[in-house]
Amino acid sequence: CTSTSTTIHTSLRLFRTFGGRRGSLRGHDREVWRSPGSTATFPSMADIYTIAAFYEFATLSNLEAYQRSLRALCERAQLRGTILLAPEGVNGTVAGPSAGIEELLVHLRALPGCQRLSPKFSTATAPPFHRMKVRIKHEIVTIGDAEIDPTSRVGEYVTPEDWNALIDDPETLVIDTRNDYEVRVGTFKGAINPNIETFRDFPAWVQQHLDPAEHRRVAMFCTGGIRCEKATSLLLREGFESVHHLQGGILNYLQRVPETESTWSGECFVFDQRVALDHDLQPGTHSLCFGCQEPLSPQDRAHPDYEASVCCPRCASSTTPEMRAQRRERARQVALAAQRGERHVGR
């Protein structure tokens, strides 16, 4: 536990605190589990929230038992966020008091095959999550192909310090494995955008656009490392031989590579209420459209079709007068709740 505490506090010194942002999490904010009789309270707005993002591919069974123990621990430790359990491992992002995060990580590392689980830490001055969800799924990151097994074979990890040299090589094909709306917010210079709506679309894109005989060296990346790691397992199965992925993902790169040496362009979309982070891992300039949940740049918000809490240039044409009226009323209720120092129940 002492080593975990040291890791958290060392990591937190690398981050400046940031405020939360309002917005749903694009299909990731469905209710999964909530303690029905909970009396625990999340830390006050004056507190600093520790955020831990983590994943580990490992062969797990007895998922229901792990779910119960994690539910109890997170309730007791006043944690909120999402933890996914599947036969292939664990994946999650959780926020709360640093002591509770320490306890959770000790518990997670006790799971079979998860001893090397290495979280990425950040902090916040406002809660990035409003619920705690512990969910059992078929996959911890959904690609839709049961034959892909990252627990048995994945590509070669590339450290952030070695990443630039790899992707600057003209013989390397660099692929962004994230969804199209994430790529739009920011990506590495020269990276290919598969233009996929979800990670489930990635295998079909590989079949249509990649060839092991032509693309002899492939380097892939994603936000925190989980999608590109699973993608390497797919490519190795398809006969690609030299397959690489960015260790710890974009967030690890932004933390460890100085901006003066960086080949990253734009901001990094994240699946919480911060929406996007800049190179210093501070909240960026993007927000989410309440209507379509697409990320919005300052230019999007300056467009005549944009109306705060109602619609944006991408969804304005499909937003009916009735929908506009409902969203305006909701925005009014949210503002009134904020004036009373309360959180609107719909947020």
Regions found by a protein language model. Give the residues of each.
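Internal catalytic-core helix/loop-beta-alpha segment
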Residues: 153-169
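Structural scaffold elements adjacent to functional motifs in cytosolic proteins
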Residues: 174-176
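Rhodanese-like catalytic fold shared by cysteine-dependent sulfurtransferases
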Residues: 46-154, 179-218, 226-347
